[in-house]
Design a protein with these regions (language model features):
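Short, ordered, surface-exposed loop/turn motifs in non-cytosolic proteins
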Residues: 35-37, 43-59, 63, 83, ...
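Short Pro-Gly-centered beta-turn/loop motif in secreted/extracellular proteins
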Residues: 48, 77-85, 93
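A short, solvent-exposed loop/turn motif at the edges and junctions
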Residues: 57-63, 85, 89-104
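Short, acidic Ser/Thr/Gly-rich low-complexity loop/linker segments typical of extracellular
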Residues: 58-80
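The canonical Cys-X-X-Cys-His
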Residues: 168-179, 229
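Short, conserved, GDST-rich strand-edge loop motifs in beta-rich repeat architectures
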Residues: 181-188, 361-391, 433-459, 505-516, ...
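Structural signature of eukaryotic scaffold interfaces centered on beta-propeller domains
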Residues: 264-284, 338-356, 416-424, 483-500, ...
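Conserved beta-propeller blade signature
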Residues: 287-290, 297, 358-362, 426-430, ...
Length: 705
C-alpha cells in the first residue's frame, strides 16, 4: 500500500444529504443546543424563505461545511457542528450572496441579504442546466443530417434526438455544460480570435481531452455545432439569461447537507460507496470509499480525515489514457499547460462493499490480451460456449481489515458491479459489449479459484418463440423468424432483481437505448436467455410526447420494478415487466411492450428548439432508495441531476418531485449514489444519502483553478 496524498482544503467534495424531521431546519431554530448555529435571514422585504445558509470552516483536516434551508419566516438552524470557527453566509435565487459572518457553535445570527441588481447578476448562481437550455438545437425537419456540403449536420445524425443525445451523453460525459467555464470560456480571451466560432473551434481541441471532444463534434457536424455553440455564447455575452429556478419548497426546505473534502483538482473520484447496498445498516459511521483513475480515496466522516492510496496491479502497467482523456494534447490545456499528470493506467471505475468488509473494485490489473483459458479452445464452460479474446478492465478488492489489495482476473470486461441476494453472494458485472459476467464469491472464497468461480453469457433473445435458445443470428444480420437473435452493445449499468433473481443491464446506444433482462437458468451458459426492452420511441402506438431516449443507469425497487434515467430526453422511467403482453417471439425486439413503461419528465427547462422531450439536464445515473436511507420513504427512485446541481427524488405514489439542490460550490456533477443508516433510532440524524463531486474537470467548479 502506498499513500500518495492526504487531502486538505482543495479539490473535490463528498456530500451527505438527509431530509430532516417534519418540522424542518427553519422551524427548529428555537432549539437550544451548543453545537448549533441558528438565526434568521432578512432582506428589506422581511424574512427570506427557501434560501440556503452555508456554514464552513477550514479548522478541520478537510474542508467541512453544512448547508440548510430557511423556513417560511426566514429562520434557520445549522445543527450538530464540530467545534470550530465558521464563516456563515447565505445564497438564494434572486439575491446576491450575503457577507460572511464569523460564528461558532452556540451563536445566533441575523444575516442581512439584498436582491440582485440585475437579472444577469441574479443568474450567476443558477444551475448549469438553466444556462444550457439557452442553446438552440437544429429543428426536427433538418434531420437526417446532410453533411458538410449540405446543412452541416453529420450524416449519422438520423433525427433530432440523436443530436440532443450527443449534447448530453457526449458533451457532458466528463463535466457540466452551461457552467461558467463552458458558457463564457473565461480561461481564454475570445477577443484574441477572429470570431466566437474560431474561439470554440480552439476550445474543443485543448488539453488531453481535446481529441475526444474534437471527434465528438465531427460526428455531430462540426461546422453546425460550432455555429450553435458560438451563438449561445454570444447571446449570453449580450445579456440573455435563463428563467429563474424555483426556490426550495415544502419538504425541500427540510434538507440538511454535510460536505467534506476529498480527492483533489487532478485525481477525480468516479463513484463512491458507503455500505452494502443489500443492507444499508452495515458499517455505521465508517469511512466512505471512492475510486477513480489509479487511486482509492478513503474519507472518515467522523474524524474528517481523507487519504488517497495508489492501487496496485497484478502485472506492471504502462502509462495510458482512459475513456476521458489521452496521454498527450495537441494544444496545451489553458489551465494546466503540459503539466497535468497522465498516469491513469489502472482505470479504476466503480466500488461496491460486500457483507464481509471487502471493497470490490472494477479496475485494470493486467494488459488487455486475455489468457488462453478465456479464448477459443479452452475447456472453461463459458469460454467453450462464447470465447473472449480481450478484456480492458478486470476486478480487485480492498480488504478493509488487512489493508491490502487482492486482484481477480476476469475474461469479460468490467464496468459496474452489483451483488445478488443469493446463497452464492454472486457478484454481477457489466462492461462487455457481448456478454454479462459473474463471480461466485462464495466459491471463490472456498477455493481461491478465480477461473472456476466465474462465468458469462451472451445476450441472445428468443425471437423464434420456442422458449429456449437455439441457432441464432449475429448482430447486424437480418432477423430470421426461425432463429433467435444475439444482441451486442456496451453493457453499461447492471442490477440483479431481488424478486425473481433475473439480471438487468442498460445499453445506452443506439438511440433510444435499451434495458436487457437475462435469465441465467439451471445450466448456464447454455440456459441463459435474454429479453430486450426499449423506451417508447418512434413507436406509432405511442404519442410522441411520451417517447424517451438515452437510458444510462439502472436500478430496481423491492417490488421488482426497474428504474432507468433517460439522460437524453430527460426522464426517470419505470419498467414493469409484469404488464407486458409479449415477452418473446419475432416481435420481441425492443418496442413490443410500451405498456410496461412509465416516463416521468424531470424538473427543469427544455433545450431551445426541441420538438419532443429534450431536457437541458443530464442524468448520469440513477439509484433507488430501497430502505428509506434518505427519509422520503422506501423505494424512492433518485435521478442524478448531473447538470442541475441536484439529486432528483421522485415520490412514485404521487409523481411529485423533490429537488435536493446543492447550491455551493456550483458544479455538483454526480455519478453514483449510496445510502447508509448509521443509527436507525436517531431519526434523520442517523441516515443519509452520499454523493460526490465527480467531474473529470474539478477545476471547472466554483472556486476551482
Amino acid at each position: 500500500m502506498r499513500v500518495t496524498s492526504r487531502f486538505g482544503l482543495a479539490g473535490a467534495a463528498l456530500a451527505a444529504v438527509a431530509v430532516v424531521g417534519l418540522a424542518g431546519a427553519g422551524a427548529a431554530a428555537a432549539a437550544d443546543d451548543d453545537g448549533d448555529i441558528s438565526g434568521v435571514v432578512r432582506s428589506a422585504a422581511g424574512g427570506e424563505a427557501g434560501v440556503w445558509v452555508i456554514a464552513e470552516t477550514a479548522d478541520l483536516e478537510t474542508t467541512f461545511r453544512k448547508i440548510v434551508v430557511t423556513g417560511d419566516d426566514g429562520r434557520f438552524l445549522v445543527p450538530d457542528l464540530p467545534d470550530a470557527a465558521y464563516e456563515v453566509w447565505v445564497r438564494g435565487y434572486g439575491l446576491v450572496d450575503s457577507e460572511k459572518h464569523a460564528a461558532r457553535p452556540g451563536d445566533e445570527l441575523t444575516v442581512e441579504v439584498a436582491a440582485a441588481a440585475t437579472p444577469q447578476e441574479a443568474a450567476r448562481i443558477y444551475p448549469a442546466n438553466y444556462w444550457y437550455s439557452l442553446l438552440e438545437v437544429p429543428a426536427e425537419d433538418e434531420f437526417p443530417g446532410t453533411g458538410p456540403n449540405g446543412n452541416g449536420i453529420g450524416r449519422g445524425m438520423r433525427h433530432q434526438a440523436e443530436w440532443v443525445d450527443r449534447l448530453k451523453d457526449g458533451c457532458q460525459l466528463c463535466h457540466q455544460m452551461g457552467n461558467m467555464a463552458t458558457r463564457e470560456m473565461p480561461m481564454i480571451d475570445v477577443d484574441d480570435f477572429d470570431s466566437t466560432v474560431a474561439a470554440w473551434d480552439h476550445r474543443v481541441q485543448v488539453g488531453r481531452s481535446g481529441p475526444s471532444m474534437n471527434s465528438g463534434l465531427n460526428r455531430m457536424g462540426r461546422e453546425r455545432a460550432l455555429q450553435l455553440f458560438a451563438d449561445w455564447t454570444d447571446r449570453i455575452a449580450a445579456g440573455e439569461v435563463p428563467p429563474e429556478p424555483p426556490r426550495p419548497q415544502g419538504v425541500e426546505r427540510n434538507v440538511g447537507m454535510t460536505m467534506g473534502g476529498w480527492g483533489d483538482l487532478i485525481a477525480m473520484v468516479h463513484d463512491e460507496i458507503a455500505t452494502d447496498k443489500r443492507n444499508p445498516h452495515l458499517y455505521p459511521n465508517a469511512p466512505i470509499y471512492g475510486v477513480g483513475g489509479a487511486g482509492l480515496t478513503i474519507t472518515d466522516p467522523v474524524t474528517h480525515q481523507s487519504v488517497r492510496l495508489d492501487m496496485t496491479t497484478r502485472d506492471p502497467m504502462p502509462e495510458r489514457g482512459d475513456s476521458y482523456a489521452g496521454t498527450t494534447a495537441l494544444i496545451p490545456s489553458p489551465y494546466w499547460g503540459d503539466e497535468r499528470s497522465t498516469a491513469r493506467g489502472h482505470s479504476a471505475h466503480n466500488p461496491m462493499l460486500d457483507a464481509d468488509g471487502r471493497l470490490w473494485i472494477t479496475q485494470r490489473i493486467r494488459p488487455s490480451d486475455n489468457p488462453a483459458w478465456c479464448k477459443e479452445g479452452s475447456d472453461h464452460p463459458s469460454a467453450s460456449h462464447f470465447p473472449i479474446d480481450r478484456s480492458q478492465r478486470q476486478l480487485s478488492y480492498w480488504d478493509v481489515e488487512a489493508e491490502e489489495f487482492v486482484h481477480v482476473d476476469t475474461c469479460y470486461m468490467t464496468h459496474h458491479l452489483q451483488f445478488a441476494e443469493d446463497e452464492s453472494d454472486t457478484l454481477w458485472l457489466s462492461g462487455s459489449t457481448d456478454v454479462v459476467g459473474w463471480l461466485n464469491t462464495k466459491l471463490y472464497d472456498e477455493t481461491g479459484d478465480e477461473q472456476a468461480a466465474q462465468g458469462w453469457c451472451p445476450t441472445i433473445v428468443d425471437t423464434s418463440g420456442d422458449g429456449r435458445i437455439g441457432e441464432y443470428t449475429e448482430p447486424g444480420e437480418p432477423q430470421d423468424p426461425t432463429k433467435d437473435m444475439r444482441l451486442d452493445g456496451f453493457a453499461y449499468g447492471i442490477i440483479p432483481n431481488p424478486v425473481d433473481g433475473s439480471i438487468w443491464i442498460a445499453r445506452r446506444l443506439p438511440v433510444p437505448g435499451s434495458i436487457v433482462r437475462l435469465e441465467v437458468g439451471d445450466s448456464p451458459p447454455e440456459s441463459c436467455i435474454a429479453e430486450v426492452y426499449e423506451p417508447p420511441f418512434e413507436n406509432p402506438a405511442v404519442d410522441p410526447s411520451q417517447w424517451g431516449h438515452g437510458g444510462r443507469g439502472i436500478d430496481v425497487d423491492r417490488n421488482g420494478v426497474l428504474w432507468t434515467a433517460l439522460g437524453g430526453s430527460g426522464h426517470l422511467a419505470s419498467f414493469d415487466r409484469s404488464k407486458c403482453q409479449v415477452l418473446n417471439g419475432p416481435t420481441a425486439t425492443g418496442q413490443h411492450c410500451p405498456e410496461g413503461w412509465t416516463l416521468y419528465p424531470t424538473p427543469g427547462p427544455q433545450m431551445k428548439g426541441v420538438s419532443a422531450a429534450g431536457s437541458a439536464d443530464f442524468h448520469y445515473y440513477n439509484w433507488v432508495d430501497q430502505f428509506n436511507t434518505l427519509g422520503l420513504g422506501d423505494n424512492v427512485p433518485i435521478a442524478n441531476g448531473t447538470g442541475s446541481d441536484a439529486l432528483l427524488a421522485l415520490l412514485p405514489d404521487t409523481g411529485e418531485w423533490v429537488t435536493l439542490r446543492v447550491p455551493y460550490p456550483l458544479g455538483f456533477y454526480t455519478r453514483g449514489l449510496d445510502g447508509r443508516i448509521d443509527d436507525a433510532e436517531a431519526g434523520w440524524k442517523g441516515r443519509g444519502v452520499w454523493a460526490s463531486y465527480d467531474s473529470v474537470t474539478n477545476w471547472h467548479n466554483e472556486g476551482g483553478k
